[in-house]
């Protein structure tokens, strides 16, 4: 299986390239979508974020704007948020790759 990774800065066309691969039927793992899903559905993520960034989780909803204010511009806070999210994103990517290896998918994209 060929694993193609899309990398680059903001505005470099990664999302456009991912859409093109999807249109050709190539499975694409979208790390941004995984983060969004974690922020919406993962209760442990909610708990971890609430503990580290008080006032950013209301009930079962992460206030993304409040979290952004707490994190961006503060490198240590950003690293703390990444420490909560990145291991889970890596696990999701590993599950995606395992699934497609079993299926015999010839090409997948990690975005």
Residue ranges and their predicted role:
Residues 15:
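Walker A/P-loop
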Residues 109-111:
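Structural recognition of the conserved hydrophobic beta-strand(s) that form the central parallel beta-sheet
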């Amino acid at each position: 299986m060929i694993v193609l990774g899309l990398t680059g800065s903001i505005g470099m066309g990664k999302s456009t390239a991912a859409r093109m691969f999807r249109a050709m039927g190539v499975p694409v793992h979208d790390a941004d979508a995984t983060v969004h899903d974690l922020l919406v559905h993962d209760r442990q993520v909610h708990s971890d974020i609430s503990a580290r960034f008080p006032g950013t989780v209301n009930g079962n909803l992460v206030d993304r704007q409040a979290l952004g204010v707490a994190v961006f511009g503060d490198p240590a806070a950003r690293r703390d948020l990444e420490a909560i999210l990145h291991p889970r994103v890596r696990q999701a990517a590993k599950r995606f790759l395992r699934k497609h290896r079993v299926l015999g998918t010839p090409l997948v994209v990690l975005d």
